[in-house]
Amino acid sequence: MTPELNWLSDPTVFAVNRLDAHSDHVCYRTVQEAAQRHSSLRQPLDGMWRFVWSSCPAQRPADFWREGADLSGFGTIRVPGHMETQGYGQLQYTNTLYPWDGRSALRPPQVDLNDDPVGSYAREFDLDAGLRGQRVCISFQGVEQAMYLWCNGKFVGYAEDSF
């Protein structure tokens, strides 16, 4: 499947290859892991990620998700964290109904592709040895608008509102 930018404004597409909502319990391999509250069944990806902010989708780096892509223009950002509170884009305050208020005359599900900031994140990691050969799922808990996910250069899925 090829990811499409128009999914952002298509109300019939809100998830592609996403698991159904479910209870998110923490599971442990052993009683000792439970006592220590550290599960070898999870691999946190918190920390510093490669990052570049773009003012709109057309300005985002093309093909940054490909294996071996040149990320020399990327900075870093702490994950978890909001890009706006880390110096990128404009903060959204609760006294403004929508981020585009006063800038664009939009009605949902329209998206102003000329004024829709994009954060492009990249992270390299090795899967923990205990997880190799197992079914592995990735969870993003806090993507504000929408996200497209690639792993090892292959499109994995699309999701909106991961809160």
List PLM regions with ranges.
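Accessory beta-strand-rich segments of carbohydrate-active enzymes
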Residues: 2-20, 27-36, 50-54, 82-86, ...
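Surface-exposed, flexible loop/turn segments at secondary-structure boundaries
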Residues: 57
